Structures are given as structure tokens and as C-alpha cells.
Curated annotation (Swiss-Prot):
Organism: Mus musculus
Record's protein name: Alpha-L-iduronidase
Lineage: Eukaryota, Metazoa, Chordata, Craniata, Vertebrata
GO MF annotation, one: L-iduronidase activity
GO CC field: extracellular space; lysosomal lumen; lysosome
Record flagged with keyword Electron transport: no
Main location, first listed in the record: other
Expression across tissues: Ubiquitous.
Any one Pfam family match given in the protein's UniProt record, by short name: Glyco_hydro_39_C
InterPro entries: GH39_as, GH39_C, GH39_cat, Glyco_hydro_39, Glycoside_hydrolase_SF, Glycosyl_Hydrolase_39, Ig-like_fold
Annotated S-S bridges: 531-567
Amino acid sequence: MLTFFAAFLAAPLALAESPYLVRVDAARPLRPLLPFWRSTGFCPPLPHDQADQYDLSWDQQLNLAYIGAVPHSGIEQVRIHWLLDLITARKSPGQGLMYNFTHLDAFLDLLMENQLLPGFELMGSPSGYFTDFDDKQQVFEWKDLVSLLARRYIGRYGLTHVSKWNFETWNEPDHHDFDNVSMTTQGFLNYYDACSEGLRIASPTLKLGGPGDSFHPLPRSPMCWSLLGHCANGTNFFTGEVGVRLDYISLHKKGAGSSIAILEQEMAVVEQVQQLFPEFKDTPIYNDEADPLVGWSLPQPWRADVTYAALVVKVIAQHQNLLFANSSSSMRYVLLSNDNAFLSYHPYPFSQRTLTARFQVNNTHPPHVQLLRKPVLTVMGLMALLDGEQLWAEVSKAGAVLDSNHTVGVLASTHHPEGSAAAWSTTVLIYTSDDTHAHPNHSIPVTLRLRGVPPGLDLVYIVLYLDNQLSSPYSAWQHMGQPVFPSAEQFRRMRMVEDPVAEAPRPFPARGRLTLHRKLPVPSLLLVHVCTRPLKPPGQVSRLRALPLTHGQLILVWSDERVGSKCLWTYEIQFSQKGEEYAPINRRPSTFNLFVFSPDTAVVSGSYRVRALDYWARPGPFSDPVTYLDVPAS
């Protein structure tokens, strides 16, 4: 494959098509680049009163480990439906309503373990107790439940942590998916006031938004528009005051297969909101289900590979380049979430709207589960290298400048760490995407010209690259004949192509200019990361733990929160059978904070330790070791 990649790097420009020119000026920062895209979500299946069986399943525990392992907090939030169905309720004589939070505690602990925040929808009815929010007693009891819940988790995790949570209303109220709860429009407003006051009692720093729905033009979406009217000038159920707080407005606009359609719909909704309710012109806007296509379980080939990854990047770039860069826009856009943390199922391991591909391997004793990292999850790690300030960048073809609604696009950023010019970095991410369409037999010539890079200590750059030939477990699976129960060797081969193809660090050219010529398939992603050498080597890897897969296989997961540097080449993983002499495990360069160890020998019992290596081959300190005792063969 390295020979193939070398040939790819040296490929001459196609004569049949004029090249796309991507110009980036590292000396021209334009505006802050805030990572508004670091969110995902999922919904447990019916029946929702058994949500614990899905949310706390081993499969979901593995899934959340993968999501939490995106480098540099590349995904921070998981937005979950029906959380309150993880609580049970009973009414006892003389004691009133009693709640059991055991399952919800366990699930939130699981998020904490993976350094993830909940997008906390106040959705569900504990043990089916709440049935009617036009019933004033139930409205008061709901306020008490919300207050109890918030105070519980402030006590458990601390106010600093819980104040980061996005509490939100019941999902999509105009879709009337309330299970057995009667929810009129007035009942929904009563419910909202109870959520607001319950949270406020716990702490005024807790934020609440909604309604998390489509906001179709009036007279459609009556609950959406009624909530805005109520928060603007309605009467608070509890205080009698005019108006109720609305800390953010959440809406759902998906793309119907089109990237630009998401932004166009958002802009239309927000324009109508601001016309009808000018008091909300500064209220943060969340699109917390901004998927390119509705229907998470609908199998689509493009959801399986780099097509989906490049499309997600394109949507984000359109928001940054067409919305944040638009000085005439008054929209305060804060969050874009893809609702793609579901678990895929047979016979569609790759092609549903998921971040991982799940294989339920039932031909082992006992049966076990394997997950593979799809490119759409891998690319969130590339996106995490974009931070600091957005740089001036331009795409043109034959002299005509192209906006982000074209096949080739770019996002570029520069990072100036406080107090240490020695750790300056610049990131350029180029995508080729025709939305949901792949063109396997067509490549386009692209020239990158990066200028304005200041001189720095040991200045180097790396190149990372993804396409459907070199970086697609789905393509590998297809070439194997789509086995239902892949063997250990087949899983190893698929995992060989989970990461981008990485071109080793090389010195940045003198005079602060770099020119690269590439032939890029559609879809593909090309990232260039330029760094000066930090004064110190990487910090220590922390939170190392081992999770069992099956006999002779395990997962190692760790945290990069103390590593500090983003100029990382790989993590070195060492193994010792006796816990004395360690030897490195041979693997491809990867900065993903998770590794599946599945050696030919099937010998995995022993001790493990991990350390980061930066672009200058400097190691950080080893993590504390973790010891693993293998699952016995049966």
C-alpha cells in the first residue's frame, strides 16, 4: 500500500481537467474558529420503558468508548432520547413519590467514564407515572422531579460539570411522540415551565432550550411557535411573571441528501423567528439533528464510507464559510449535531446512520460483538485539529473563485498557544464531495498553495489522506465477500484501513511556502498539519483501561487530556506478559485513543502501557500500566 501511496503522491496533474487551486494564507487570520460540530446522538428502540437494556448494553458501552476516543475531544456531547425512562417511580403512603435513579446513574457514569457530556432531553415518564400535563398536580410533581434530578447530579458530578449540560425539552413535540403522555399545546407549555423552574431551583446556571423540532412555517408546527410565543410574552405557570427563559432555540433541519439544504433551511427558520420574535435575535441556535438524510436505519451505501465523512465536513465548512463569515447575518449559531451514535444491525453493519459498524459475531462461544470505526468517526479526529482562528482560504478553478457549495472546499485554521510561540500550528483540511454521490473512476487535480507560514523551531508538516480505496473498512469488507461473521484475521485487515494514510513528518520548506499537487478522487479528504516543535515533549497518557472483546482480543482505551500537544504522530503501545519487560506492539501510526489488540498468537493476558510520540519522535511519559486477564477459551 505504501508503494501505491507513493505513486499517488507523485501522480502528474490530469491534462483533461484544469486543476482546482486551493490557496491558504497562514498570516491572515479572519475570525475565531469555534468547534460547533462536536456532538452526536441516538434514540433507544421501543419499548422505551426498557431503554436501559439498550443504553446500558455491552454493545452501547463499546460504542461510547469509540465515540469518547476521538482525539482532542473531537466529540464532546451525546444527545439521548427517553432518558427519564431510565428512572422508575412509585408512590408510597405517607412518603409521596419515590424515584429510583439506578439506571440513569449508571448511564451518566458511563458518559463520564468516556469524557462525554449528555445532551439531556427531559423526555420520558418514569414507570409511566406522568400522563397529563394539563393536570396541575402532575405539573408540580414534574417540577419537583426535575429539581431532584438536577440537584442529584450536581452533587454527584459537581456544578461546574453539570452546568455544561444542554438540558432540552421533549424531542420534536409537533411529531406527538409522547408514548402514553397526553400533551396538548397548553400542556407542553406547562411542562416547559416545570422544566425551567425545576432546573432553576437546583441552580440558575443550568441552561434549558428547545423545542428540538422542524419549525415548519405557520400554521404548521404549532407547539414550536407556541413555545417561542410563551417564552417571549406568555405567563409563567409557577411565578405568574410574563415571559420564561429560553437559553437556546433548538431546531431540526436535515438535508434530504443535499449539503447546502441544511443551511438554507436553518436560515429560513431563523429569519422567520427573528421577524416574529425580535427578542430572540441574540438567542443561540442549535441544529441538534442536522443529518444529511432522515431515517437513521435506512441503509444507504454512501453512509458506509468516506462519502459520508466528506459530506459531514462539507456541511460544517458551509456553515463556517457561508454563515459565520457572513457579517450581515445576525444568527448566533452555536451547535450542529449529527444524530449518528446508533448501533447498526444485520445485514447493514456499515450502511446505516452510525459512527461505528457493529458485527454481532454469533459463531463464537460465547457470541461476541465487534465494532469498526467508520470514516465518519475517524474524520472527527481530523476536524479536532482545526482550532484557534480561521485562516483566509480560497478555492478557484480557471480563475473563477468558488464558494463552499462546490465539489472542492477547504477549512483552514491557525493556533497560537498562550505564552508559547514555539508551539504554533496551522491546519488545512481539503475535501472533495459531491454530497451523497461517489465517483469511483474519476479523480480531479488539486493544487494547494500554503503561504505566510512564519519561521519556527524545527517546523514540520504531515499529510493525512482518506479515500474509499485506502481508508475504508467497508471497501475491505466488500472485497472479502461481505462475511456475516468475519474471522479475527478479516477484522485485522479491516482495522488496517480505519485510519488515514499518513505521510511522515518532513521539514517545512524555507520561505514559508508549500505547494502540493494531488489527484483526489470524489470523495476524499486531505489534511496538512504544520507545527513548530513545542518546548516540551507530550504529556502523560491517562485513564488507560482494557475492555474484553473475545478470547485473544481486547480493546485498550485511554485519554489524551494531559498530553497537551496536538502535533502527535502516534501512540506507542507496549505489552508485557509478566509485567516486567515491555515490548512495543507493531501497528500503523494512529492518534485515535483506542486500540484493538488481536494478535495471531491470541496471547493477550499481561500488562499494557501507552505513551504519545510527537512529530519529532519525542516520547511522553508512559501511562500507568493496566493489567488484563484474558477471557478463557470455551
